């Protein structure tokens, strides 16, 4: 067994034993957390088995190659496969973020730039929906505030995986680097003189919280209802179906008007509220932890301007890792893996460096 994985494999076996104990399921929060962690560690066991197999095959092929030179090609192939597996192993050499395996709630908000910014927010929404489709994830629009020209002033989407994932490969683990300000440079549809304008939209990515993850006292909530409004502010419903929830202790406010049912809007608003409260708690913990590592390394954290989309040059630039590519049309069609891989690799390198220092 490969030593860097031994602790994680032992943890996987321990959790398996805990989940087999009926008493654990009397505590839904604990059972859910254990199940999530168990699924997250499953790829570790698979990787360990694969490493053992390839190492054994390589040792045997090397011995055979001493007697028969025709086995040298097999030695080379197995050596390359082992190198790929060891590269995957790097992801397990740093602590696995338990939130990486969670589903996510993604919020896109138009920023500076008026209607053009709202149109760009719509472009970003489509990009993420197409990416989710490519990954086989399920999406659900929780709330949407459309603009006059078909964009979005703000929109919230739940993104769910269909099965367990490895480190950094869950929905939240994959999308978490998207948080920040995204900037667009192009000629707006509202521009008659053909001048290039710059506008922006903000993206927030939160791990989705279950009810058992975040306890909300109903007495801490102020719930207001109002009529839904569409583009231009016109009413789209004759009943007070839209819901605004204020979490009094923190001042967090969530509004939902996407559904015709007040109950459905309330449920969606509570989902977003739980995610925001969990995200706030996570950021507080990360902020405290970052004080200890700040002098060691700068990881790929959210920053003000994370990415620029230049339509005239068909160029995408991620400013955190110096990534540039002239395939903007493909990226906006959901081909995000290349830039997300670059961000994940930079983050892993930074965390490995911090761990070694």
UniProtKB/Swiss-Prot annotation:
- What is the protein named? Peptide chain release factor 1
One MF term in the entry's GO annotations: translation release factor activity, codon specific
Question: According to the lineage, what is the superkingdom?
Answer: Bacteria
Q: Which NCBIfam families match?
A: prfA, PRK00591.1
Q: Does the keyword Acyltransferase apply?
A: no
Which family does the entry's similarity section mention? Belongs to the prokaryotic/mitochondrial release factor family.
Taxonomic lineage per UniProt?
Bacteria, Bacillati, Actinomycetota, Actinomycetes, Frankiales
| An annotated GO cellular component | cytoplasm
Organism of provenance: Frankia casuarinae (strain DSM 45818 / CECT 9043 / HFP020203 / CcI3)
From the UniProt record, report the name of the gene that encodes this protein.
Answer: prfA
Cite the InterPro entries for this sequence.
PCRF (IPR005139), Pep_chain_release_fac_I (IPR000352), Pep_chain_release_fac_I_sf (IPR045853), Prokaryotic/Mito_RF (IPR050057), RF-1 (IPR004373)
Which cystines does this chain contain? none
Entry keyword Protein biosynthesis: yes
Q: Which UniProt keywords apply?
A: Cytoplasm, Methylation, Protein biosynthesis
Q: Which residues carry this modification: N5-methylglutamine?
A: 234
This molecule's function is given as:
Peptide chain release factor 1 directs the termination of translation in response to the peptide chain termination codons UAG and UAA.
Localization, UniProt: Cytoplasm
SMART domains referenced in this protein's UniProt entry, alphabetically = PCRF
Q: How is it modified after translation?
A: Methylated by PrmC. Methylation increases the termination efficiency of RF1.
Q: Name one Pfam family in it.
A: PCRF
